[in-house]
Amino acid sequence: MGSFSIWHWMIVLVIVLLVFGRGKIPELMGDMAKGIKSFKKGMADDDVADDKRTVEHRADETVSAVKEKASKS
């Protein structure tokens, strides 16, 4: 009773086809694929930008730490 049979899924499929039509479903799937691709590209771009900022920040900290030690001596 808690699980869906094949007939439940067939009825859902028929209702979806009636609501959206045959031409609209591929268009929606294409738009969803473009959105996922754009999201992945954005995440990859953020990772590269974050890596560059982290490396530059650590280099600055090292230089300032060395200068402070040199000025104290």
Curated annotation (Swiss-Prot):
<keyword id="KW-0813">Transport</keyword>
<keyword id="KW-0997">Cell inner membrane</keyword>
<keyword id="KW-0811">Translocation</keyword>
<keyword id="KW-1133">Transmembrane helix</keyword>
<protein>
    <recommendedName>
        <fullName>Sec-independent protein translocase protein TatA</fullName>
    </recommendedName>
</protein>
<dbReference type="Pfam" id="PF02416">
    <property type="entry name" value="TatA_B_E"/>
</dbReference>
<comment type="similarity">
    <text>Belongs to the TatA/E family.</text>
</comment>
<dbReference type="GO" id="GO:0033281">
    <property type="term" value="C:TAT protein transport complex"/>
</dbReference>
<dbReference type="InterPro" id="IPR006312">
    <property type="entry name" value="TatA/E"/>
</dbReference>
<comment type="function">
    <text>Part of the twin-arginine translocation (Tat) system that transports large folded proteins containing a characteristic twin-arginine motif in their signal peptide across membranes. TatA could form the protein-conducting channel of the Tat system.</text>
</comment>
<keyword id="KW-0812">Transmembrane</keyword>
<keyword id="KW-1003">Cell membrane</keyword>
<dbReference type="GO" id="GO:0008320">
    <property type="term" value="F:protein transmembrane transporter activity"/>
</dbReference>
<feature type="transmembrane region" description="Helical">
    <location>
        <begin position="1"/>
        <end position="21"/>
    </location>
</feature>
<dbReference type="GO" id="GO:0043953">
    <property type="term" value="P:protein transport by the Tat complex"/>
</dbReference>
<dbReference type="InterPro" id="IPR003369">
    <property type="entry name" value="TatA/B/E"/>
</dbReference>
<keyword id="KW-0472">Membrane</keyword>
<comment type="subunit">
    <text>The Tat system comprises two distinct complexes: a TatABC complex, containing multiple copies of TatA, TatB and TatC subunits, and a separate TatA complex, containing only TatA subunits. Substrates initially bind to the TatABC complex, which probably triggers association of the separate TatA complex to form the active translocon.</text>
</comment>
<keyword id="KW-0653">Protein transport</keyword>
